[in-house]
Every structure is written in structure tokens, then in C-alpha cells.
Amino acid sequence: MKHILSVLCLLAVSFWLQLYNAQTPDAYVEVLGVAQDGGFPHMGCNKEGCNLAWEHPELRRNVSSLALVDPVQKKWWLFDATPDIRRQLHDFSQRHNREYPYLPEGVFITHAHIGHYTGLMEFGKEVMNTKQVKVYVLPKLKNFLESNGPWSQLVGLKN
């Protein structure tokens, strides 16, 4: 079922991009991360590939995430709020010479693995204390976020 929802999300994004591209031909997707939920190397990993990445930071990879970028409107949307969100948002801003808002127009959470929603906590009062960042999720995850801390605090404070 999880894979079906992920595929449906990707199809919806693809369809939306096609519609959006009809109006804004320059919109594109930028990869912000490609690794599984824990990033690469994984915490506690002592295998050869992990050891190389610990020794050579250029081999490290952020958790899987995408940015949908509209260069005409200077807006962007984030797909998945990962544990690497601080670095991903900073790097995005640097790559684009701060021409875009630091925060995205909205955040789409594709599914409920920890690598896809735990970065939302960085929007809370202890870090950025954002105001009304739009987050798009499926109903079951919406209920989870509204009913469980620390996520419910984000909802309550309208971060």
C-alpha cells in the first residue's frame, strides 16, 4: 500500500508539472538528496563504503528530497522535509544566490517514513519559528501530525 501511495503521489506531481509547464515552460525539478531515510553514510555504519564517506565528506549524501522550482515567479516547493532539511534549504539558497525565498511556498510530504517528515520540526519555535508554512499530506498522516507531539505543537502554533 505504501508503494501505491508513493506512485500515486509521483503521478500527481508529474501531472501537475505537465499542467504547470504549459503555463511556465521554465519550471524544473532539482534534486536535493538521494539517500534513504538516514542519509549516507548511515549512523553506526562501519562498512567500507560508509567508512569512505565518513573520511571523505564529498561522498556523503542527503536524504531523498526534491525542489520544484519556478524561475519566472521566483517560487519553489519542497518535496519531503528530511532530517537534512537545514543543509538542503541552505544549499538551495546558496546555489541560487538567494534569489528565492529561503522557505518554500509549501511542503509536500510523500509518505510517513521518518526521512520524509521529521524535518518539519525545524520549522518550530525552537529553530525557525516559521509562520504558516503550507504542508500537504494525505489524511492519515495529517491526523498523526495534528494528534502527536512534537508535530501537534507546530500545528497549534501555526508554524
Range-by-range predicted roles:
Residues 1-24:
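Bacterial Sec-dependent N-terminal signal peptides
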Residues 23-159:
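Binuclear metal-dependent hydrolase catalytic cores
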